[in-house]
């Protein structure tokens, strides 16, 4: 998860010198806490750039074929997760998007920025995502797979996980 800083299994206190500790001290609103985990909040352009710059740095400094994200973005559908960021957004625009659409817009902006910076860092590098096998679940967690497939500038490929034995894959072809 490109937004996950730590899980409940991570030590309770990270090093005071860690990038998380430094940023959290200055800008605590850049983070969301959920079930013992801490996540970057993609509502903020700085956060999206931080993730995209990290992906570009990997492409620039290491011999990699590309960057791959798993399917998890927002850790929950719960409106309380990012309620303060959403409230700030609602106050600053004339016609705000509903919460789930706003979250999808944030993640799509993140995905597009990562794509652009990865391509700038290494034009041959690819960028892909493994979305969940159920489009509705993706949309509820912030992933707009349909939009990413419908327009250039988001991903080079999608690689949904194979279903477990006894499960059916719920993907349809979108072109």
Language-model segment annotations:
Residues 51, 58, 67-70, 118, ...:
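Conserved, mostly hydrophobic/aromatic
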Residues 1-3, 69-74, 132-134, 163-165:
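Active-site beta-loop-alpha junctions enriched in small/polar residues
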Residues 6-12, 70, 78-81, 140-141:
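Short, solvent-exposed loop/turn and secondary-structure capping segments
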Residues 26-27, 31, 35-38, 72, ...:
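Active-site histidine-acidic residue metal-binding/catalytic motifs
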Residues 78-175:
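Glycoside hydrolase catalytic-domain groove-lining segments
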Residues 1-61:
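Active-site-adjacent "subsite" loops/lids of carbohydrate-active enzymes
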Residues 63-64, 155:
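A structural motif
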Residues 60-63, 121:
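Secondary-structure transition into beta-strands, especially the periplasmic turns and strand N-termini
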